[in-house]
Amino acid sequence: GSVPKNFFPAVEKGLREACAHGPLAGYPVVNLKAVLYDGSYHPVDSSEMAFKTAASLAYKAGLPQASPIILEPIGSLKVQVPDDTTGDMMGELNKRRGRVLGMNSIGDNMTEIEAEAPMSEMQDFATLVRQMTQGSGNFTLAFLRYDPLPSTLEAAVIAGSKQLAGEIQ
């Protein structure tokens, strides 16, 4: 048997709700393609809730086989610093897993550094820029995209989310 079309929305809703909680660290699942190939239908026992639950169970069974990864937000960064602190700032960006894309002299003994960096590494960046430049530097940071989290950090993120989930429950 096949699934009647009037139950397709229930299947989709079950899958969407399941995607809100990913298998690795509990973060929402994105960029998922799912296809409903077949299913069974019984005139008495089939209900929207049954198909919604079936979709959720299929997600939980199938997603680990798809080799999911954790994505992290990457920001586009422009930092204006005095020329004499440019090297220190480049080192700081490298420590924060940043990738320097270019540098430009912007006059008045100032340099603008263009870079991309994980947003998670930029929490205290405003304080650092003020300290490093004695208040004469500034920066802009805007979300750019999501990139795969390096595998060396994945275990720590998963452990942290499990610990946090344990504290909440």
What are these regions (language model features)?
Residues 1-169:
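Accessory interaction regions appended to the cores of large information-processing enzymes
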